[in-house]
Amino acid sequence: MSMLSTTAARLISTYLSTHPIVTGYDMALLISYSYSVATRYGEGAAALAAQMYDAIAALSDVYVPPAVPAKTATIEETARSVQGARLFSKDPDVTASAVSRLVKQAGEDTTLQNAMRDGAEAAWIPSGDTCAFCITLASRGWQRVSKKSLKNGIHAEHIHNNCDCVHAVRFNGDGDVEGYDPEEYYQMYKSQPGTPDQKINALRRKAYAENKEAINAQKRSAYAKRQELNSSAAEEIKID
């Protein structure tokens, strides 16, 4: 599913490198294109998540109805994401990440919606450079999925931009994910001082301090990439 989200982000970045957003019409075209990308790759993410869910059920010797792929983002949801991203920053990567998140959302919604239907448990599994918020969620361990686990009973609430973490499911309390230790994450969270919000902020500052060089290198690489794309776009429209 990560590849689908990455491809969606790349398509949006490429589009913005050749289509400056100047007028309201330009924004409407961007939203329309983003919606088509979110739909196409969101359907793929949902279908893949459904296949994985069915495979886990089969390996667990649990008989449940075939998983139903979740619906992809609506045009209204896409518009809110794109407009919000553009208000936050004109950086193409920010908009690309927002659309990428919509793709991932379809996959995570599929996992949780079917888990709720079948009374399964889910856990938030960290991956990559895990942020403070995701560490906090991972510390909760395996929990029975209910309507409270889903925003408005539909959407997974934990999805944010540039996140590689995923929901894992298990049936009847059996099974685990290799390397996932919720107690370890809980101790990381518990060891920080203050209120829950202060604990998360402390974890965030600690993670940034530990990964400062890598984060800055990533930012420089992204900036260089944008400059290259903008240069290529300028060459394409150059009039002799």
Predicted feature descriptions by range:
Residues 1-160, 169-240:
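Domain-core detector
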